[in-house]
């Protein structure tokens, strides 16, 4: 795959064991829990050849999202304070809102699109999404793009 290869966001549960193990090896090396590739692949239970095959092609989403503008699509219940609680989480995690677009509520819900600059955020995007989804009134949240 060349530099212009397409990138995809794929949920972890559909990845093959080899790819999951490659990611785990990279995490062990990055965290210092394993000093060498040989040590890390033995801990995880993957061959070195499988690791080398995938290592340059798999990255956690957070590696690409740090310092970028990410657009989220949300479905929020039409209740006082729901959007405000979302914005409180963004501010608490040091995100900067670039744009907000909210539809007129229909049948008790409203669609909201928010673009956030993640440059100063310390939290991973995965944890950020989880924190947003725990807010009262949030029915659905997904990443549209960056």
Curated annotation (Swiss-Prot):
ACT domain boundaries: 71-146
Signal peptide (residue range): none
Disulfide topology: none
InterPro entries with a match to the protein in the record: ACT-like_dom_sf, ACT_dom, UPF0735_ACT_dom-cont
Family: Belongs to the UPF0735 family.
Protein's recorded name: UPF0735 ACT domain-containing protein TTE2621
Organism annotation: Caldanaerobacter subterraneus subsp. tengcongensis (strain DSM 15242 / JCM 11007 / NBRC 100824 / MB4) (Thermoanaerobacter tengcongensis)
């Amino acid at each position: 795959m060349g530099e212009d290869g397409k990138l995809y966001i794929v949920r972890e549960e559909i990845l093959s064991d080899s790819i999951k193990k490659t990611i785990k090896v990279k995490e062990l090396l990055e965290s210092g829990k394993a000093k060498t590739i040989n040590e890390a692949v033995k801990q995880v239970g993957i061959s070195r050849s499988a690791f080398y095959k995938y290592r340059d092609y798999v990255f956690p989403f957070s590696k690409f999202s740090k310092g970028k503008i990410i657009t989220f699509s949300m479905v929020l219940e039409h209740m006082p304070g729901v959007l405000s609680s979302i914005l409180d989480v963004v501010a608490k995690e040091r995100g900067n809102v670039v744009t907000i677009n909210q539809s007129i509520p229909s049948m008790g819900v409203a669609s909201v699109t928010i673009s956030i600059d993640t440059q100063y955020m310390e939290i991973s995007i995965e944890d950020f999404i989880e924190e947003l989804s725990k807010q009262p009134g949030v029915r659905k949240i997904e990443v549209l793009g960056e």
